Curated annotation (Swiss-Prot):
It comes from Methanocaldococcus jannaschii (strain ATCC 43067 / DSM 2661 / JAL-1 / JCM 10045 / NBRC 100440) (Methanococcus jannaschii). The gene is rps10. Involved in the binding of tRNA to the ribosomes. Belongs to the universal ribosomal protein uS10 family. Part of the 30S ribosomal subunit. This is Small ribosomal subunit protein uS10.
Length: 101
């Protein structure tokens, strides 16, 4: 049987965990095999900018960071289960990628 690999990424880990929980419930309800959610390394994006616009004065900096959390789920590619997964309401700040193997 084919397997579907679902990659989820978001800046909010609580929303990401909630979607993973919903996918896990669907898999248990439909009776398909699931492995995951596997937490992947968090990517930290850093931007450091100078506070002073003209370069005069003391050297003070603003530090901005954004963390991108990722989860990986492998699930059997059952048509009924995937239909239920497609109906999950996914917020705008969550990216989802599905690959079939």
């Amino acid at each position: 049987m084919q397997r579907a690999r679902i990659k989820l990424s978001s800046t909010d880990h609580k929303v990401l965990d909630e979607i993973c929980r919903q996918i896990k419930e669907i898999a248990e309800k439909t009776g398909v095999d699931i492995s995951g959610p596997i937490p992947l390394p968090t990517k930290v994006l850093r931007v450091v900018t100078r506070k002073s616009p003209d370069g005069e004065g003391s050297s003070t900096f603003d530090r901005w960071t954004m963390k991108i959390h990722k989860r990986l789920i492998d699930i059997d590619a059952d048509e009924r289960a995937l239909r239920h997964i497609m109906k999950i309401r996914i917020p705008d700040n969550v990216q989802i990628e599905i690959q079939f193997k």
